Design a protein with these regions (language model features):
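Alpha/beta hydrolase fold serine-hydrolase catalytic domain that processes acyl esters and thioesters
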Residues: 1-161, 183-353
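Gly/Ala-rich beta-loop-alpha elbow adjacent to hydrolase catalytic centers
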Residues: 166-179
């Protein structure tokens, strides 16, 4: 086997090189992806046994969300769950034909340049930028399927159940990649996305998906996808200029807690002008939330990955035959004259901002 052509676009070439070289030298060792329900509001007691060898999750926000800001506030807590893997919150709302699913999803939790049992790491970021399957994407789909199975939803309906994902940073990117694919291919039907601080401008979602992206002017992370500040689809983009804090301004700008407050302000603004694009988009997302008195079931899921062990056999051929990226990044010809689609990039290593 031979290495595929290096993409001509510099950013894609950088990501391809990081994934290829990192895998070759054993930095990226993500393997099989595992999920387990660790809390179920329908169980007694609600807290379930954690995976063997894992600490019990620290969970306090177990009620169904009543607003979009609640979805974001749930993410604030999930970052502090203190588990081995990443924790996401899934809420089933309604029954029968009115049934829908709400997901709160964290962003990057491990900033180490190397794989850990927590798949919300840099490898996932790189693979998502190249349009490849990632551990968190696989884990989210598996967790949703597990929640649907626990709720006795027939397997043939899993890919058609409507899902709203609220994702911070990497979580918003994972949701966008899934929403760019046909539901039958993705395994889930993402119909709504609220992304906060996510570098997802290079991914165009399906036309039937309602997506609101929130980005602070001082937050550098949304610009880390190598794409200009433009909308590749019909998304509604919300910005906010922050007052500089006394310390740690970059952390403050990207903090999930800061975005929770911004989303709360956004909902108030949308309530005042419900007729404009933002008002209509927010109304569409809020329609997924539980109505007063509507039945809901909340489950928390831990997602973790196995780590591949080095072998004595050369893995060069595995690294050299990486898969074609799909979906491909959005190209803006005015900014990248002479650019062409990625011909071939990375495939096939691991299961997996």
């Amino acid at each position: 086997a031979s290495l595929p052509l290096i993409p001509r676009r510099g950013y894609d070439a950088l990501m391809t090189g990081m994934l290829t070289v990192g895998t070759a030298v054993g930095v990226w060792r993500g393997g099989g992806v595992n999920t387990r329900i660790i809390r179920d509001s329908a169980a007694d007691p609600a807290m379930l046994e954690p995976p063997e060898g894992h600490p019990e999750a620290q969970i306090r926000r177990a009620a169904p969300p009543e607003s979009l800001a609640d979805l974001c506030a749930d993410i604030d807590e999930l970052y502090w769950a203190a588990t081995t893997g990443a924790v996401i919150k899934i809420c089933r709302v309604g029954t029968g034909g009115a049934r829908r699913w709400l997901v709160s999803m964290v962003g990057t939790e491990s900033m180490r340049f190397g794989s850990t049992h927590n798949p919300a790491d840099i490898e996932v970021n790189i693979r998502l930028m190249l349009g490849l399957d990632s551990a968190m994407g696989v884990g989210l789909v598996a967790a949703l399927h597990r929640a649907m199975a626990a709720d006795s939803v027939p397997e043939e309906q899993w890919s058609s159940e409507p899902v709203l994902v609220c994702g911070h940073s990497q979580g918003g990117l994972v949701a966008s990649v899934l929403a760019s694919r046909d539901p039958a291919e993705a395994g889930v039907n993402v119909v709504g996305i609220l992304s906060t601080g996510a570098p997802n401008r290079r991914v165009a979602v399906r036309p039937d998906v309602t997506i609101v992206t929130v980005a602070h002017d001082q937050d550098v992370v949304p610009s880390m996808d190598g794409s200009p500040d433009r909308s590749p689809d019909r998304r509604v983009t919300v910005g906010r200029t922050l007052v500089r804090p006394r310390k740690r301004p970059l952390y403050y700008a990207h903090s999930s807690a800061t975005y929770t407050e911004t989303v709360r302000l956004m909902e108030r603004r949308a309530a005042v002008t419900p007729w404009d694009r933002l008002g209509k988009a927010v109304a569409a997302l809020r329609a997924m939330l539980p109505a007063p008195g509507e039945e809901a079931r909340v489950t928390h899921h831990e997602i973790w990955q196995d780590l591949l062990e080095p072998t004595a056999v050369s893995t060069w051929n595995t690294v050299a035959s990486l898969e074609r990226a799909d979906p491909r990044a959005v190209t803006y010809p005015i900014d990248y004259e002479g650019a062409r689609p990625i011909s071939a990039t990375a495939r096939g290593i691991g299961a997996a901002w």
